[in-house]
């Protein structure tokens, strides 16, 4: 892992030199007991994805990753801190064991580091623009919205508006939440040996963005622990090293948009091969048929790319709205147009 730390430090220094990244500030608790705070968050689509943790307890990944936030869905969270009692989490109107376990891990970190002795109440609601799908980054939206609401209730509004600090808190809920909290086109800096407050998400830029379209897809196959499967592949270490080299290449090319979109498509194929090599087969016929359809048509379009994650939904991207629309219409794709989200909410109710 020493060489990965060296590559990671090189990337960190490059980002510091560009002036787009800084280690997160830390805050002291100033808890607003019995007051309710509301915040929202948005899902992400991974351009340059991550699988595998260096430090699973603190959700520090083995390498950096790049993603962008979308408005395919959104998440609203309310948080209230009580002086005593038990933690309570309501998800879409019901108790949810999955999110309770994830929240308890993050709250355990919060209580230990900041010496907080209190109970937390959360009400979480996902708002979808599609009926049901896997792979459109909903867990990232939950993590970032929850982190914002917690930051407001525990540390105050200044902390809740500090994207670096919110990203830091979100990472302890979900790795993908780190980039959702940063917003727009963002990178999560992570590598073996990185300092805890340094492993955060940050916005790469606000301009020169792109256009995208989602094909939401359900899957009958349960997504198990993809991180463990990926790490068990005999190709994993080579894949990890290639990630660092590609990120360095992307930075040296000033985060060229079309270069990142092209890398994203290549990364999707490598990710699929990596998972299949470890026996993790989640890709169904319907998904593969659409991938073939998209791929066979790309030669007729100079500026269209697509990607997907371990979930089966697919996102088509282009720097040209006209080219993307022509591609979607010509192939008669069934999905939804997306935009970069504009409105972040943090408020006391």
UniProtKB/Swiss-Prot annotation:
Lineage: superkingdom: Archaea
Record bears the keyword Lipid metabolism: yes
Catalytic reaction equation(s): (R)-3,5-bisphosphomevalonate + H(+) = isopentenyl phosphate + phosphate + CO2
Keyword Signal included in the entry's annotation: no
pH and activity: Optimum pH is 5-5.5.
EC number: 4.1.1.110
Pathway, per record: Isoprenoid biosynthesis; isopentenyl diphosphate biosynthesis via mevalonate pathway
Keywords: Isoprene biosynthesis, Lipid biosynthesis, Lipid metabolism, Lyase
NCBIfam families xref list: mev_decarb (NF040847)
Assembly behavior: Homodimer.
Family assignment from sequence similarity: Belongs to the mevalonate 3,5-bisphosphate decarboxylase family.
UniProt miscellaneous comment: It is proposed that Thermoplasmatales adapted the classical archaeal mevalonate pathway by replacing mevalonate 5-phosphate decarboxylase (MMD) with two specialized enzymes (mevalonate-3-phosphate 5-kinase and mevalonate 3,5-bisphosphate decarboxylase) in order to produce isoprenoids in extremely acidic environments. It was found that at low pH, the dual function enzyme MMD is unable to carry out the first phosphorylation step, yet retains its ability to perform decarboxylation.
Protein name (database record): Mevalonate 3,5-bisphosphate decarboxylase
Organism the protein comes from: Picrophilus torridus (strain ATCC 700027 / DSM 9790 / JCM 10055 / NBRC 100828 / KAW 2/3)
High-level lineage: Archaea, Methanobacteriati, Thermoplasmatota, Thermoplasmata, Thermoplasmatales
């Amino acid at each position: 892992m020493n060489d990965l730390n060296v590559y990671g430090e090189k990337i960190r220094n490059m980002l510091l030199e560009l002036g787009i990244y800084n280690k997160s500030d830390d805050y002291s608790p100033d808890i607003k007991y019995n007051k309710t705070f509301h915040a929202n968050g948005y899902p992400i689509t991974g351009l340059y994805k991550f699988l595998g943790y260096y430090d699973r307890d603190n959700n520090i990944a083995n390498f950096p990753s790049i993603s962008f936030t979308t408005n395919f869905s959104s998440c609203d969270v309310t948080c209230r801190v009580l002086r005593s009692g038990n933690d309570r989490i309501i998800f879409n109107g019901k108790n949810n064991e999955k999110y309770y376990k994830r929240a308890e891990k993050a709250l355990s970190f919060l209580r230990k580091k900041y010496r907080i002795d209190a109970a937390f109440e959360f009400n979480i609601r996902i708002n979808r623009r599609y009926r049901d799908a896997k792979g459109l980054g909903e867990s990232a939206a939950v993590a970032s919205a929850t982190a914002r609401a917690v930051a407001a209730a525990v540390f105050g509004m200044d902390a809740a508006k500090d994207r670096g600090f919110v990203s830091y808190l979100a990472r302890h809920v979900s790795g993908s939440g780190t980039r959702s909290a940063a917003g727009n086109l963002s990178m999560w800096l992570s590598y073996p040996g990185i300092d805890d407050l340094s492993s955060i998400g940050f916005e790469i830029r606000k301009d020169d963005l792109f256009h995208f379209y989602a094909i939401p897809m359900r899957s009958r196959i349960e997504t198990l622990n993809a991180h463990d499967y990926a790490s068990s592949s005999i190709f994993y270490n080579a894949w990890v090293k290639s990630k660092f080299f590609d990120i360095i290449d992307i930075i040296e090319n000033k985060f060229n948009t079309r270069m990142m979109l092209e890398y994203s498509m290549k990364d999707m194929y490598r990710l699929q091969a990596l998972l299949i090599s470890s026996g993790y087969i989640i890709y169904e016929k319907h998904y593969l048929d659409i991938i073939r359809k998209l791929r066979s048509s790309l030669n007729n379009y100079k500026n269209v790319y697509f990607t997907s994650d371990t979930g089966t939904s697919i996102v088509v991207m282009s720097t040209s709205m006209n080219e993307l629309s022509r591609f979607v219409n010509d192939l008669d794709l069934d999905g939804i147009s997306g935009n970069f989200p504009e409105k972040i909410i943090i408020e006391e109710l």
